[in-house]
Design a protein with these regions (language model features):
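Radical SAM enzyme [4Fe-4S]-AdoMet core and its adjacent flexible, acidic
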Residues: 1-95, 102-103
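Flexible mid-to-C-terminal extensions adjoining Fe-S/redox cofactors in radical SAM and related proteins
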Residues: 113-194
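Sequence-level detector for tyrosine residue identity
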Residues: 26, 39, 77, 98, ...
Length: 194
């Protein structure tokens, strides 16, 4: 046993969210229960390739996430965790984090790897740190409207790409933190009573 930690991200939309309990059953059948962490992420229309009608609104996803955690707890999974401070925001806005696509083009954000117009360089040439696109990423600032938000330490303004596109990038925890705390409280009591 090598003590490897596996984290599985399940991208959900209005179609597949109804089946989230089945995937947990499948992991158990494979003998993976207790050997991995699982979390949900909403499908988004970041690059215009998917149907927006299938995507969740922020509050809908927050409810789906809470439902998923409840199902997981009922099935004996223990991936219930409180959100932690996110001091790094996103690798895309840090100076030394890059994404390289199969062609060798360099980007700051994974969502941009299919968009040649978003590349900031390539692996065959030195990176120009004065490149306008590069500077735009690393000069990201937390929006003023976020500075008074009680969950700022968790999201740090949210996804910079969503922030640019939609002017709002609030994570599910903004809408479900009270339910999440209630779940943690209930689960902790049950664990204590064992």
């Amino acid at each position: 046993d090598r003590n490897l930690q596996f984290i599985i991200r399940i991208n959900v939309d209005n179609d597949n969210a109804k089946s989230i309990g089945k995937i947990l059953d499948y992991f158990e059948e494979l003998g993976l229960k207790g050997k991995l962490d699982v979390y949900l992420a909403p499908v988004r229309t970041m690059n215009g390739q998917c149907n927006n009608e299938k995507c969740f609104a922020e509050k809908e996803f927050a409810d789906t996430e809470i439902n998923f955690i409840k199902i997981g707890l009922e099935k004996g999974y223990d991936f219930l965790e409180l959100p932690e401070c996110n001091l790094g925001i996103c690798g895309a806005v840090s100076q030394n984090c890059y994404v390289i696509n199969a062609k060798g083009n360099i980007f700051k954000c994974l969502n941009d790897i299919a968009k040649d117009e978003c590349k900031i360089g390539d692996v065959l040439h030195p990176l120009d740190c004065e490149n306008e696109k590069f500077v735009e990423w690393i000069s990201y600032e937390i929006p003023d409207e976020c500075k008074e938000c009680k969950i700022l330490p968790i999201c740090m303004g949210g996804c910079p790409v969503l922030r640019r596109k939609e002017k709002k990038a609030c994570p599910a925890v903004k809408y479900n933190y009270q339910k999440l705390l209630q779940l943690v409280n209930e689960w902790s009591k049950k664990e204590y009573e064992k």
